[in-house]
């Protein structure tokens, strides 16, 4: 009986800890998204890119210019540029200095380095999980601060270093 009471008590403690994490998550304020460039399905009509209601296999950035009332479209290609990027989790303590990088569309890049070198931080900056202190990050020539976060994240493919495979075939794990 003492063994069972101990196991039940342990289950209660684990449940309370899980509940506490859930309530902390529910209390979080939603992240602000001030982006206005969106990702849309598109088609080419002659040399002009137009938005499509159907899935076309082609994506474009839709940029509405408030000042002129004009909407333009730019085909999603996928080049990423870091131009003199500075970042620190605490703005007073910059940990990444003058980062310059260019990734061509479709190019596969691996960030390699020791623990704490900034590999994950760079992928977090591309996803706009954090804002940079200085410099620019551009995606297809567009400052990523102008792109809606959800659309930006939909357009990226990132493979992290920790892979988790489950029982089954490779296809079942995909």
Regions found by a protein language model. Give the residues of each.
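Short intracellular "coupling" helices and adjacent cytoplasmic loop segments at the cytosolic face
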Residues: 24-42, 89-90
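ATP/adenylate-binding site constellation spanning eukaryotic-like Ser/Thr protein kinases
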Residues: 18, 28, 149, 153
């Amino acid at each position: 009986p003492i063994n069972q009471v101990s196991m039940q008590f342990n289950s209660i403690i684990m449940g309370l800890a899980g509940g506490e994490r859930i309530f902390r998550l529910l209390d979080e304020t939603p992240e602000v998204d001030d982006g206005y460039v969106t990702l849309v399905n598109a088609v080419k009509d002659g040399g002009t890119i137009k938005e499509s209601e159907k899935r076309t296999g082609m994506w474009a950035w839709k940029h509405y210019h408030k000042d002129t009332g004009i909407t333009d479209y730019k085909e999603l290609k996928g080049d990423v540029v870091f131009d003199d990027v500075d970042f620190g989790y605490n703005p007073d303590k910059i940990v990444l200095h003058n980062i310059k990088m260019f990734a061509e569309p479709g190019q596969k890049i691996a960030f390699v380095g020791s623990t704490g070198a900034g590999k994950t931080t760079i992928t977090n900056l591309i996803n706009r999980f954090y804002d940079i202190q200085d410099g620019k990050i551009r995606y297809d020539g567009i400052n990523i601060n102008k792109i809606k976060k959800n659309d930006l994240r939909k357009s990226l493919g990132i493979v992290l270093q920790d892979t988790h495979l489950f029982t089954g075939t490779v296809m079942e794990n995909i």
